[in-house]
Amino acid sequence: MLSPKRTRFRKQHRGRMKGISYRGNRICFGKYALQALEPAWITSRQIEAGRRAMTRNVRRGGKIWVRIFPDKPVTVRPTETRMGSGKGSPEYWVAVVKPGRILYEMGGVAENIARKAISIAASKMPIRTQFIISG
């Protein structure tokens, strides 16, 4: 699972996801990519599940790049706890994804193989996505 080695602060505000992604919205490394169409928090488990699904499908053929990193801690309070007494403890990590952001890239394989592998990874994501080709 992906997570930062160390952060400056243990806890963060939730924030809000306005607008579209201006950074990380172009294909940089591979030829094919999976692009987000909706805003969401994507957990490190979901990122890893998508990466594993793609790797298993492509076998040794191509190369895969994960273009998002979960750097936001999400805190959860223990169950049946009364209100107050501070914020909960960090439970898992999420990547904040806005529409237009590239999630995964792939290269070194035929288009039909890439399309199949990326569609399997897309089914692991909690948002609508699209398959795009560079060029």
Swiss-Prot record:
Q: Which Pfam families match?
A: Ribosomal_L16
| Family named by the database record | Belongs to the universal ribosomal protein uL16 family.
Which Gene Ontology cellular component terms are annotated?
chloroplast; mitochondrial large ribosomal subunit
Organism of origin: Eucalyptus globulus subsp. globulus
Signal sequence, start to end: none
SUPFAM superfamilies the record matches = Ribosomal protein L16p/L10e (SSF54686)
Q: Name one GO biological process term.
A: mitochondrial translation
Tell me the keywords, alphabetical order.
Answer: Chloroplast, Plastid, Ribonucleoprotein, Ribosomal protein
The record lists the lineage as: Eukaryota, Viridiplantae, Streptophyta, Embryophyta, Tracheophyta
Q: GO MF terms on file?
A: rRNA binding; structural constituent of ribosome
Q: Record's InterPro entries?
A: Ribosomal_uL16, Ribosomal_uL16_bact-type, Ribosomal_uL16_CS, Ribosomal_uL16_dom, Ribosomal_uL16_sf
Q: Which gene encodes it?
A: rpl16
Whom does it interact with, and what assembly results? Part of the 50S ribosomal subunit.
Cellular compartments annotated: Plastid, Chloroplast
Please report the name of this protein according to its UniProt entry. Answer: Large ribosomal subunit protein uL16c
